[in-house]
Curated annotation (Swiss-Prot):
Reaction catalyzed: a UDP-3-O-[(3R)-3-hydroxyacyl]-N-acetyl-alpha-D-glucosamine + H2O = a UDP-3-O-[(3R)-3-hydroxyacyl]-alpha-D-glucosamine + acetate
Species, as recorded: Oleidesulfovibrio alaskensis (strain ATCC BAA-1058 / DSM 17464 / G20)
Family to which the UniProt record says this protein belongs: Belongs to the LpxC family.
Pathway named in the protein's UniProt entry: Glycolipid biosynthesis; lipid IV(A) biosynthesis; lipid IV(A) from (3R)-3-hydroxytetradecanoyl-[acyl-carrier-protein] and UDP-N-acetyl-alpha-D-glucosamine: step 2/6
Protein name: UDP-3-O-acyl-N-acetylglucosamine deacetylase
Enzyme class: hydrolase
Gene (UniProt): lpxC
Molecular function in Gene Ontology: metal ion binding; UDP-3-O-acyl-N-acetylglucosamine deacetylase activity
Cofactor: Zn(2+)
GO CC field: membrane
InterPro entries: Ribosomal_Su5_D2-typ_SF, UDP-acyl_GlcNac_deAcase, UDP-acyl_GlcNac_deAcase_C, UDP-acyl_N-AcGlcN_deAcase_N
Amino acid sequence: MNQTTIKKTIGCSGIGLHSGKVVRLTLRPAPEDTGIVFHIRTEDGVHRLTPRPDDVIATGLATTLGLNGSSVATVEHLLAAIRGMQIDNIQIDIEGNEIPIMDGSAASFVFLLKDAGIARQNKPRQVYRIKKPVTYERDGKWIKAAPHDGLRIEYTIEFDHPAIGRQSMDIEVTPEAFAGIIAKARTFGFLREVEYLHSNGLALGGSLDNAIVLDEYNVLNEDGLRFDDEFVRHKILDFIGDMALLGAPLQGHFQVHCSGHALNNGFLRTISEHEELYLKRVELSETAQREHAVEAAPAGTPVAA
């Protein structure tokens, strides 16, 4: 399996979650072995950032990357789309300091990538594969990883809320599975948190148009949920995006319990800092390519945990 990039430059604009201002995003083809690279345009010039786990400077409302005084926030949905669609090399130009939130999912980014087209390059794809079982745990939340030829995610969430409760999903992530099952799941938050954030000048771009918002009992969005288990699907989306910072796609079997951006990044830093123990660099030849079956419940049906 060879490396890939997009066939043409494509862009969009949208509201920034934090600033509430319009942000311009442009995606460009990139040469082999480039990986994912950000060009962040600010008032003092253009800053180039090839993200790694230790470039994460904040994990509060979203994952924020920073280097040499420049930063870009809410990167996880775009990164999930890039990894989910198996694009290896791409340049991301951003005018401002955050990725547009769009509708709160990765669907718009998948649409952009498909519209740009995917070009197969000449060099073989390089991936990181989990070498041996590893567990990362904090405060009853954990990530367990084991060797696997592909990307399989078993994810469970538990919320003391009648509209969420306990949800689980087990999925083998392929481009088809990502686009059809994961990409459309939106981010979610609680009304009490939104009101607090707005009162403190935060999340000014957040609304019912780009997030699922819940009060103490119900979903407030007029159109309801896209899937009965949209919450766990979005957590898988976030996980894929947060795992995209190694410099190459990550393969393994991941069992995840109630994780979030901070735990995801802590896990990624651990396996990155101890690469010789936990990671194996693998070159995927064309003859080794195989299709992974989608191991997931039918749309809208949680898997019993």
